[in-house]
A protein has these predicted regions:
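Activation on beta-sandwich/Ig-like modules and their edge loops
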Residues: 17-192
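Sec-dependent N-terminal signal peptides
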Residues: 4-14
Length: 192
């Protein structure tokens, strides 16, 4: 009897650990990635800071109550409730919606105003799901191997392919001038 009880307890523990792991990795496996970052615009074309996220999964994702943060936990933007991101769709989160839409009037969907900006040299961009679990994180810099042209010259940071490890600077390139918010990246290689 004790042995049966121990086996049942062990099975319950294993199943609960598996469920926890699935929940923890749910965001990572979901395919929602930080895909483009505008952290230091040129003086002549300044929509202010913005971040593009992309749904590379085959599922529609409910991003309601997800959080965008920089390296400071006090700097966060809650994505509005019922924000659905269909497969292959982009979402732009911008610091200043008026400045952003004045220069990119055709981009949709977008949300803002973030209430904080990104560091002009280096910073974190972090995305958390509605359970507070980290979904994606990029720690960019304005030094190699990160593309230096994205630092005030006009281009943005663009991920070469959404399946690449976006924590590595060599997987990012400087965009065409002003970036491609809400659209396929100008540097998209099509290669994983």
């Amino acid at each position: 009897m004790k042995q049966t009880l121990l086996i049942i307890t062990a099975l319950i523990l294993m199943l609960s650990c598996e469920d926890t792991q699935t929940e923890s990795s749910d965001g990572i496996d979901a395919g929602v990635v930080i895909n483009e970052i505008n952290y230091n615009s040129s003086d002549s074309f300044d929509p202010d800071d913005w971040v593009e996220i992309y749904n590379s999964s085959s599922n529609t994702m409910d991003l309601g109550s997800w959080l965008l943060k920089d390296e400071n936990d006090d700097h966060f933007f809650p994505i509005p409730s019922n924000t659905l991101l269909i497969p292959d769709q982009y979402l732009v989160l911008c610091t200043d919606t008026l400045k952003f839409t004045a220069l990119f009037p055709d981009v949709s969907p977008y949300y803002g105003d973030l209430g904080f900006g990104l560091g002009g040299g280096s910073d974190f961009v972090r995305l958390f799901d509605s359970n507070g679990l980290l979904v994606d994180m990029v720690e960019y810099d304005d030094d190699a191997p990160w593309p230096i042209l994205a630092d005030g010259s006009g281009p943005t940071l663009e991920l070469n392919h959404p399946s690449l490890d976006n924590t590595l600077g060599e997987n990012w390139s400087a965009s065409e001038d002003y970036g491609t918010p809400g659209a396929v990246n100008s540097v998209y290689t099509g290669d994983e």
